[in-house]
Amino acid sequence: MIIQIYQLKMESSNIGNIYVNNVDQNQSETNQSQIEVDQKQAEISISNDIDVTSKIEFDNGEFNYVVEFVDKSNGKDTITINCTHKEEFYCWSFTTSDIIKTSKLTSKEDSASLNINIKPKMLFKIFSAHEKNTLDKIYQIGFPKRFGSSESSITIELITVLPMMDSYIDTKFITLNPKKIDEVERCSLKFMRLNHIIEQKNQENIQKINKEIEQIQVSQSAFSEYVREKYAKIDDLSDSLTEKEKENEFVMQFKKFLTKPEYVNIIIDALKPTLDKYVTSEALENRFDSELEEFALESYCQSLFAKKTDLDKYVLKPV
């Protein structure tokens, strides 16, 4: 009986321990869950405190534009437009967190006009679409063409015309004010740009010259191959001909050459100095006298032979 009572006490104490352990475990899990929730909230709070910055850059005419949009966690979004002249390197800037209101209202029929308020985020999207050449036709951006002086402001004109309402135009002027820039730095930028242009031009000339050299090398290679082929054919032809065949070929080509009067005149002109040197008038006279003597001797022999023949006519022949 005592043993049973002891066992019952032990069982009851174990049950109490199990209950206490379960309570402690549940409490620990609850604390862990709370810690995880606090961490997530802290992460969300930190992420909400981070400002997101977007930036685009493009050229228009003589100016370079850098548009920067900051999506702030407090909802006070900001847009900044920086403009730089690409040759003189004067700078202008515009920054706002306010709604860009209508600057000028026009109506062809003097009736109700448009009044569209554009927030910085929307303005940034308009410039982004312009930079990507995807800007809707309802928006027209007029960029400045030139500037008056380094101290004068420049203006960007933004026009909005809604479909089917072309009689109503919403116009906004965004004024960019001049920024101070160190004159030494500005001149340095100008020299850097000039040096870049010179290097770019030299590189273009080098590429052009290299291309011409490659074309010349290709032509030279083709011509060399042509000459080698011709010499190879000549060598093969000369090896296959005998001396007699070569002589006959030369005579045939020479006769063909002499059939054209202009070529004969060329030969005569070429031989004239030699003929004038060796064929003199004295040599011609001696040769003429020699030929006359030969002709007289030949005529005398012929006359003697003729006389003997005549005598034979009168000689009596035996019967």
From Swiss-Prot:
It comes from the Viruses. Residues 200-253 form a coiled coil. Keywords: Coiled coil. Belongs to the mimivirus R73/L269/L862 family. This is Uncharacterized protein L862. It comes from Acanthamoeba polyphaga mimivirus. The lineage of its organism: Viruses, Varidnaviria, Bamfordvirae, Nucleocytoviricota, Megaviricetes.
